[in-house]
UniProtKB/Swiss-Prot annotation:
NCBIfam families attached to this UniProt entry: galU
Role: Catalyzes the formation of UDP-glucose from glucose-1-phosphate and UTP. This is an intermediate step in the biosynthesis of diglucosyl-diacylglycerol (Glc2-DAG), i.e. a glycolipid found in the membrane, which is also used as a membrane anchor for lipoteichoic acid (LTA).
Protein name: UTP--glucose-1-phosphate uridylyltransferase
Pathway: Glycolipid metabolism; diglucosyl-diacylglycerol biosynthesis
Domain of life, per lineage: Bacteria
Record's catalysed reaction(s): alpha-D-glucose 1-phosphate + UTP + H(+) = UDP-alpha-D-glucose + diphosphate
Gene Ontology molecular function terms on file: UTP:glucose-1-phosphate uridylyltransferase activity
Organism (species): Staphylococcus haemolyticus (strain JCSC1435)
Regions crossing the membrane: none
Length: 288
C-alpha cells in the first residue's frame, strides 16, 4: 500500500464573506494572531508527515506564495538586529514542506479545484485539507484519517457532529455500521435541505482520497451552486468502492466566517501566556 506523502490545499476562493478586507488580500492570509490561517493548515499537514503540498490558487493569491518563500533580505535584517525569535518564526514557515502551486482558472467548485491538481498527485492516495477549519488535536486530524486509510486501503472522510439546525450548511453522511470512530457510509449528501439530513455527522474539511476519485471528478456534473461538488463525486465513488467516514478527535475552529474568525482569534489569544492576563482584564473592563 502506498504511503500518503502529498496533500492538496484549495485556496482559490474569492473570500467574499470578508470583503472588503479580501478585495486585494487572500482570505487565507488573514491572521490569527501572528500567523496567517493557511499556515495553521500547512503545519497540520507537515506534522502528519506530508512532504509535498500543492496549493490550488487563483487571481490575487500571490501573497500566499510569497509567505512560504525564502525572504533573505528580511532574514538578514532580523539577524543583524538580534531578533532571533522572529528570525526563527520566519524561517520555520519556509521549511514546513515542499510547496507547489497550480492555478484554478475558473471558480467551478471544490471538486473542480481538486481535479486541477490531478497531474501533481498522479496515481497516489492523497490528503485534502480545507482552509476554513483549523483543528487543534494531539494527533493531527489528517493523520487520524491517514491511520484509517492504512487500516482499510480506502478513502476516508473526516466528520464531526454538528447541531441539527445547521446540517443544511454541510455535506452530511448517512452512516451504516460503526466501529469505534469509523463509519461505513450508505450515502454522502451535499448540503441537504433543512430538516432532511440523514444524520448530524458533517464533513469537516479533511479527506484522504484514493486516485480513483479523479475519474469520478472528470465526469461529475454540476451540483449545488452550479459547481462541481467533491461530495457528489465521493458519493458516486462510494457506490463502486467503499468510502469510510471517521469522527476525528479535536477542537475545530471555523475561520471561514467572521464570527468564527473572531472567536478563534480570542481563544488563541487566551492561550498565549503573553496576552492572556491583559486580554482577560480588557474583556472584564468592557462590562459584558
Amino acid at each position: 500500500m502506498k504511503q500518503i506523502k502529498k496533500a492538496i490545499i484549495p485556496a482559490a476562493g474569492l473570500g467574499t464573506r470578508f470583503l472588503p478586507a479580501t478585495k486585494a488580500m487572500p482570505k487565507e492570509m488573514l491572521p490569527i494572531l501572528d500567523k496567517p490561517t493557511i499556515q495553521y493548515i500547512v503545519e497540520e499537514a507537515s506534522r502528519a508527515g506530508i512532504e509535498d503540498i500543492i496549493i490550488v490558487t487563483g487571481k490575487h493569491k500571490r501573497a500566499i506564495e510569497d509567505h512560504f518563500d525564502n525572504q533573505k533580505e528580511l532574514e538578514m535584517v532580523l539577524e543583524e538586529k538580534g531578533k532571533d525569535d522572529l528570525l526563527e518564526k520566519v524561517q520555520y514557515s519556509t521549511d514546513l514542506a515542499n510547496i507547489f502551486y497550480v492555478r484554478q482558472k475558473e471558480q467551478k467548485g471544490l471538486g473542480h479545484a481538486i481535479h486541477t491538481a490531478r497531474q501533481f498527485i498522479g496515481n497516489e492516495p492523497f490528503a485534502v485539507l480545507l482552509g476554513d477549519d483549523i483543528v487543534e488535536s494531539e494527533t493531527p486530524a489528517i493523520k487520524q484519517l491517514m491511520n484509517v486509510y492504512e487500516e482499510t486501503g480506502h478513502s476516508v472522510i473526516g466528520v464531526q457532529e454538528v447541531p441539527e439546525s445547521v446540517t443544511h450548511r454541510y455535506g452530511i453522511i448517512d452512516p451504516l455500521e460503526k466501529e469505534g470512530r469509523r463509519y461505513e457510509v450508505k450515502q454522502f449528501v451535499e448540503k441537504p435541505k433543512q430538516g432532511t439530513a440523514p444524520s448530524n455527522l458533517a464533513i469537516m474539511g479533511r479527506y484522504i482520497l484514493t486516485p480513483e476519485i479523479f475519474d469520478y471528478l472528470e465526469t461529475q456534473k454540476e451540483g449545488a451552486g452550479n459547481e462541481i461538488q467533491l461530495t457528489d463525486a465521493i458519493e458516486r465513488m462510494n457506490s463502486d468502492i467503499p468510502v469510510y467516514a471517521y469522527d476525528f478527535d479535536g477542537d475545530r475552529y471555523d475561520v471561514g466566517e467572521k464570527l468564527g474568525f473572531v472567536k478563534t482569534t480570542i481563544e488563541y489569544a487566551l492561550k498565549d501566556p503573553k496576552m492572556k492576563d491583559e486580554l482577560i482584564k480588557f474583556i472584564k473592563e468592557l462590562g459584558f
